[in-house]
């Protein structure tokens, strides 16, 4: 499939809608918690078991983004979006078959493994292209697209709940819901495949963008720098703290207020998931755009520092007030989404646009790690507390304390980030070989 090069006069503002059509679709992953209670009931699963498809999906997202990042740079966004469409939709179809036959392993394989590959390739497919179209506003550009991933659950959560109400929450009803998801998202993602274009001067394999200013670092060199691994820690900590709540959102708010005079219904819990998705989406465009004004390091100070404060409030006072619980959770998820949307621009600031898509793909292995850690911490702690006879907010107290600690670790890592040493830079066309050799011989500094 040849790269879709933009014709003369093509408006760059037509590219974000193409990215949104893909990201809004694959963002359904954030609505997985709506399927957890029906699956647990229909297939007799624990909370930890019902999280497996989501966890594996996030693992595969990071791995496929890491190993496929360079290929996406070479083949272009249309090829990547096509692969994402096939894998993501096929994952739902396999899951439908697994639900209909009562074979949970097929749901884990379909949604988690096959669909997870679609998540990873689809997630990174427009990022490098958008940065090349909008070199003047990288935070805003990536925020527009990546907010679709956060907003996907805003659509999918109530839609999935409505389908389960209509089809039923037994094996057959869940299978029909998965089937409709797979077919619908295939059509919607096809819009992105048709619409996406790359700049004429930034074709994959054409040597990068038309104008590349500042340091330019290859993907191979980037992973050898302390800056890459510090950002990896920052992203891992921020994502772990957010994804644990997001994956457990519906049962968590139900448990927190189960013993009150106004317990939370299943419909209200699904609405809470939708609100979190709205905050996730708003944070991606709002905070990433703000980062263009105040800088990436400063915005991550907000994500990590204020995020720890929000978790502390939920831990100490969350069960005393629904508005406080919801408000703190919304702020946390806005930081979570903003962290994702801002990191491509942070990478661009540190490593340039030369292979920023491939570098971004490698960094998303942090998401894979967090996708296991976050749900594992929250679900495992909740399961153990339940076995000990505890209930309500006591199921989550230890998890909240752990999340606070993780955010503090991320805050420290962000403070240690410094500009990349010149010895890692790709020599420009006018750089003498001797100067490039001298740069490589200089000692590393943080």
Can you name each region flagged by the protein language model?
Residues 235-244, 267-343:
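C-terminal transmembrane helical hairpin of 12-TM major facilitator-type secondary transporters
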Residues 86-100, 306-319:
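C-terminal ends and interior cores of transmembrane alpha-helices
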Residues 39, 120-134, 141-142, 338-351:
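Intracellular juxtamembrane helix-capping segments at the cytosolic ends
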Residues 175-195, 397-416:
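Symmetry-related core transmembrane helices of the 12-TM Major Facilitator Superfamily/SLC fold
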Residues 198-216, 423-433:
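Flexible cytoplasmic inter-helical loops of multi-pass small-molecule transporters
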Residues 137-158, 361-375:
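Glycine-rich segments within core transmembrane alpha-helices of 12-TM secondary carriers
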Residues 32-37, 157, 220-288, 374-379:
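Extracytoplasmic gate region of multi-pass secondary transporters
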Residues 55-70, 274-286:
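Central cavity-lining transmembrane alpha-helices of secondary-active solute carriers
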């Amino acid at each position: 499939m040849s790269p879709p090069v933009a014709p003369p006069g093509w408006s760059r503002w037509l590219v974000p809608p193409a990215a949104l059509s893909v990201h809004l679709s694959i963002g359904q992953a954030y609505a997985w918690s709506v399927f957890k209670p029906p699956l647990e009931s229909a297939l007799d699963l624990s909370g930890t078991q019902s999280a497996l498809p989501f966890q594996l999906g996030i693992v595969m997202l990071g791995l496929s983004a890491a190993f496929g990042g360079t290929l996406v740079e070479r083949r272009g966004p249309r090829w990547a979006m096509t692969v994402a469409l096939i894998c993501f939709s096929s994952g739902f179809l396999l899951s439908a078959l697994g639900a209909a036959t009562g074979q949970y392993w097929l749901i884990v394989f379909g949604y988690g493994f096959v669909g997870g590959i679609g998540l990873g390739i689809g997630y990174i497919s427009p990022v490098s292209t958008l940065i090349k179209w909008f070199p003047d506003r990288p935070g805003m550009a990536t925020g527009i697209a990546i907010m679709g991933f956060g907003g996907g659950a805003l659509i999918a959560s109530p839609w999935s709940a409505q389908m389960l109400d209509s089809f039923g929450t037994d094996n057959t009803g869940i299978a029909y819901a998965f089937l409709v998801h797979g077919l619908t998202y295939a059509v919607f993602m096809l819009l992105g495949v048709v619409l996406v274009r790359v700049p004429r001067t930034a074709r994959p394999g054409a040597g990068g963008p038309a104008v590349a200013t500042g340091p330019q670092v290859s993907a191979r060199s980037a992973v050898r720098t302390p800056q890459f691994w510090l950002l990896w820690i920052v992203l891992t900590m921020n994502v772990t703290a957010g994804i644990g709540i997001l994956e457990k959102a519906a049962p968590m708010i139900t448990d927190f207020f189960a013993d009150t005079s106004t317990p939370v219904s299943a419909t209200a819990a699904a609405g809470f998931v939708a609100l979190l998705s709205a905050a996730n989406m708003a944070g991606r465009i709002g905070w990433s755009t703000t980062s263009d004004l105040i800088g990436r390091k400063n915005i991550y100070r907000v994500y990590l520092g204020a995020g720890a404060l929000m978790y502390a409030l939920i831990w100490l006072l969350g069960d005393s007030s629904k508005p406080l619980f919801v408000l703190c959770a919304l702020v946390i998820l806005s930081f979570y989404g903003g962290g994702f949307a801002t990191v491509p621009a942070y990478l661009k600031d540190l490593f340039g646009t030369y292979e920023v898509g491939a570098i971004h793909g490698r960094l998303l292995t942090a998401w894979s790690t967090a996708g296991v850690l976050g749900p594992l911490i929250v679900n495992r702690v909740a399961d153990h507390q339940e076995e000990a006879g505890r209930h309500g907010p006591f199921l989550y107290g230890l998890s909240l304390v752990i999340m606070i600690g993780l955010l503090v670790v991320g805050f420290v890592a962000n403070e240690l980030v410094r500009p990349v040493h010149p010895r890692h830079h790709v020599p420009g066309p006018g750089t003498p070989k001797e100067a490039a050799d001298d740069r490589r011989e200089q000692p590393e500094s943080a």
